[in-house]
């Protein structure tokens, strides 16, 4: 188990660095003479036709709806593995990070709502500061990897996975549009087939690829967000085959590098490019970016730590052996690194045709500000609280 976590941390840490580079490149492109090339490239129309069926979308939407669906397949598989075999496989293991994650979703949303309560045009962005970017957060942890207790890394992994699950539920419930019953019917049939394949332990991944593609296309046309198809596909991959094969492990192992080093950096490059032209301190201090930034910087750590502390106080959960509440607070601050999933939810909340590009830009700036501050403060707190001398004293 520990070796798997260490291997995962190395992968995610490198991915976190690449995400940062991709985001910086996007900001450079968006704020130099290359900005026209950058934005026009993202709006390039790409069409796929199959008889009467066609999907015609800008390149940016293919990244957000298509490539990110592959990432969500990985998320679905990770959640399933942790629920059945890993750090969430029993009540005792799951309750502490689950309560922490719940606080880390509720309090940031409340902070955002409080700041934007008099700005109805911004209120649909309440879910933006709820998410944690596991790649960025683990990238920071990896910088101090030698002195960070393994139990603390497991806690962060479990919390981030539950966070992802919460984000998936939020997307499903609050960011779906007008429904197409025909497309939903096709999607439902595809899901039934996938569940049956899982039930009868079909291990041929090509079968899941074919039915999964049909599911993704029908969900895309249905009005439900297409990335949710990825989660369903991930959950339907069997953990074990009839002859002891491990299809979920094999697919997870195959997809993880592609997601970490191609899909997520591409998503970051496509979505982090915010033009600062016309921006002012007044705009940066307006309710939208302020709500997002403070939701991440204040709401996240307060929510994660407060709910954890109360759970321990009431005897609902116990602090995992080998770590202390000071270290939990440091991790809680790192949970304010919301980059990837926050950008994704911001695109759903403000990226539609009825929302202006400047509103989405303000949301993204709030995410960048909040993520940067949370990363810096979280790093120093983690460094201080995991010093060997303090560990012995604790």
From Swiss-Prot:
Catalytic activity: Na(+)(in) + 2 H(+)(out) = Na(+)(out) + 2 H(+)(in)
Record Gene3D superfamilies: Na+/H+ antiporter like domain
Membrane-topology annotation of the record: Multi-pass membrane protein
Compartments, as annotated in UniProt: Cell inner membrane
Coiled coil residues, start to end: none
GO biological processes: regulation of pH
Matches recorded under InterPro entries: Na/H_antiporter_dom_sf (IPR023171), NhaA (IPR004670)
Pfam families assigned: Na_H_antiport_1
Major subcellular site: membrane
GO molecular function: sodium:proton antiporter activity
UniProt keywords, alphabetically: Antiport, Cell inner membrane, Cell membrane, Ion transport, Membrane, Sodium, Sodium transport, Transmembrane, Transmembrane helix, Transport
Transmembrane segments: 11-31, 59-79, 95-115, 125-145, 155-175, 177-197, 203-220, 254-274, 296-316, 328-348, 365-385
GO cellular component: plasma membrane
Family the entry assigns: Belongs to the NhaA Na(+)/H(+) (TC 2.A.33) antiporter family.
Function as written in the Swiss-Prot or TrEMBL entry: Na(+)/H(+) antiporter that extrudes sodium in exchange for external protons.
Classification via PANTHER family: NA(+)_H(+) ANTIPORTER NHAA, SODIUM ION/PROTON ANTIPORTER NHAA-RELATED
Protein name: Na(+)/H(+) antiporter NhaA
Gene source species: Actinobacillus pleuropneumoniae serotype 7 (strain AP76)
Chain's gene name: nhaA
